[in-house]
A protein has these predicted regions:
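Extended alpha-helical targeting/anchoring segments
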Residues: 15-499
Length: 499
């Protein structure tokens, strides 16, 4: 054995000696009843195993213990309110799926990759298998984690190919994870949960606990943008695209179109630092950091796309934005101005109606309803107008059926959805890539939570990209809409500028 290997073994043994009492006393949060429907090891279905880890105040520090493990992802409830209190960390999936155009590459650990032209949503559902019990009390016990890029919508609808596809990220990047770290900010507790679908998981359990309990490796290289970000729709080009949208509306082609501009710059270092900074200045309940072979994804989304828990479906579209003010009185006035805005309420209700129709494709008839309309939710940089639509998943339907029925989210397309997507393709110079897609998880237990991938930054191929946009309707004002897009981009651009 070489000296370096011997030293590593000694270090692992030292860490194990500190965490062995935890290993010997692991227990489920709640005991599963005798004979309950649970995953059986050996048949591909196993009762989840749960070990409580020492809780660390810094989830970023815990994530860094994953080091160079492939496909590391952090689903981050950075706002840490009572409703969104859990963080989920995963890495080293036993299988990955990456879709580019009509082809999905499926790569299982240790096997040669294969390709399929079947619908990607079907492929992910197939890998998840039959619904089984999760770990009681935890939102996620293993399953699929990753993103569906906006352009995956081309597999669902006939959209022309006009915009340039210049970011070499997959349309879909999903990992199947046998284990996960789940952090409850409210209870200040942390667990490692695993299923044993991958035979290495339980064999490597002590080493995994040791890794997650050890000091993290050194920080990666600092992130730096080398030049000022450039928009693909400058002020004049944005105005021309805005006028084209309103021409479509006057002709009756659509009611609303989400028009977006993209900012791009050369960058060096690691976008991890951009994410850490972003969650400091703009914490959001549906944030995420994805460290993928193709690039890194940084997301600070305030918007839920689809949640499914115990058959209850929820979506929370955002339409309507005002900037925050440091002056408390002015800040309250901006929030009330948004609440009272007829234009923003009209935008919002258009998307509520669209999503009610989308949910109706997979929900029990009569169960879909708008439970809340025009709530104000305030974040670090903006106030948002948010509504909530709920339903009950129909028998025989799966989380992936729901995603396919609703994708991409109506709040980032417009209405009618397909017409709006065609207009977006006509007017936006570049494809959206990860932006305006969805990031989240789909568990072996049938539950799901996903975001709308807005307030998103992608680092790929020596460059960094971010986007911002908003809904254009008949009585929109070009100056107001352009400014709204800049307000939404403010936090991302500040991070890109190193502020």
């Amino acid at each position: 054995m070489c000296l370096a290997r011997a030293m590593q073994c000694k270090k692992t043994a030292e860490v194990l000696s500190r965490v062995q009492p935890v290993l010997e006393n692991w227990r489920p949060l709640v005991a599963l009843p005798e004979g309950s429907r649970a995953r059986q090891r050996g048949s591909g279905l196993a009762t989840p195993r749960v070990t409580e880890l020492t809780h660390w105040a810094s989830t970023a520090r815990r994530f860094r213990t994953l080091g160079k493990l492939p496909w590391a992802m952090w689903l981050d409830s950075a706002a840490a309110d009572a409703a969104e209190r859990f963080d989920i960390l995963v890495a080293d999936p036993y299988l990955t799926l990456r879709t580019r155009g009509a082809v999905t590459e499926i790569a299982a650990r240790g096997d040669a990759a294969r390709e399929s032209r079947r619908p990607p949503f079907e492929l992910v559902r197939e890998q998840l298998g039959d619904v089984a019990e999760g770990a009681p009390g935890l939102p996620f016990s293993g399953g699929a984690v990753g993103y569906f890029g906006y352009d995956l919508g081309r597999r669902l609808e006939r959209i022309p190919s006009i915009a340039a596809a210049d970011i070499a990220m997959p349309d879909l990047a999903i990992g199947l994870y046998d284990w996960a770290v789940v952090i409850d900010h409210a209870a200040r507790r942390t667990w490692l949960v695993g299923n044993g679908l991958d035979e290495r998981t339980f064999a490597d359990w002590p080493a995994l606990v040791a890794r997650l309990s050890a000091e993290p490796p050194p920080e990666p290289p600092a992130f730096r943008v080398r030049a000022r970000p450039v928009s693909n729709l400058g002020r004049d080009a944005y105005a021309a695209a805005f006028r084209a949208v309103q021409d479509h509306i006057r002709r009756g082609d659509c009611y609303q179109v989400n028009l977006t501009q993209r900012f791009e710059a050369e960058a060096e270092g690691d976008a991890w630092h951009a994410y850490v900074r972003l969650r400091e200045i703009n914490p959001a309940p549906f944030a995420a950091y994805l460290d993928l072979p193709d690039g890194k994804v940084v997301c600070s989304s305030p918007e839920r796309f689809l949640s499914l828990r115990d058959g209850r479906v929820e979506t929370k579209p955002i339409k309507g934005t005002r900037p925050r003010s440091q002056d408390p009185e002015r800040d309250r006035a901006l929030a009330e101005e948004l609440r009272a805005s007829a234009k923003d309420r009209a935008e919002n209700v258009m998307i509520v109606d669209l999503l009610r129709n989308d949910l109706g494709k997979c929900c029990v008839p009569g169960s879909v309803r708008a439970s809340k309309l025009f709530d104000i939710e305030s974040f670090a940089s903006v106030h948002q107008l948010v509504s909530t639509v709920e339903g009950r998943l129909a028998p025989g339907k799966h989380a992936l059926d729901l995603v396919a029925a609703c994708f991409p989210g109506g709040s980032i397309t417009g209405a009618p959805k397909v017409a709006a997507m065609k207009i977006i393709e006509e007017l936006e110079p570049h494809r959206r890539s990860v932006y305006c897609g969805s990031i989240g998880y789909m568990g072996f237990d049938g539950n799901m939570d996903t975001n709308i991938a807005i307030r998103t930054l992608v680092q790929q191929g020596g460059r960094v990209y971010t986007w911002a946009g908003g809904g254009v309707i008949a009585d929109s004002n070009v100056d107001a809409e352009y400014q709204e897009s800049l307000d939404k981009a403010a936090a991302m651009l500040a991070v890109m500028a190193g502020q």
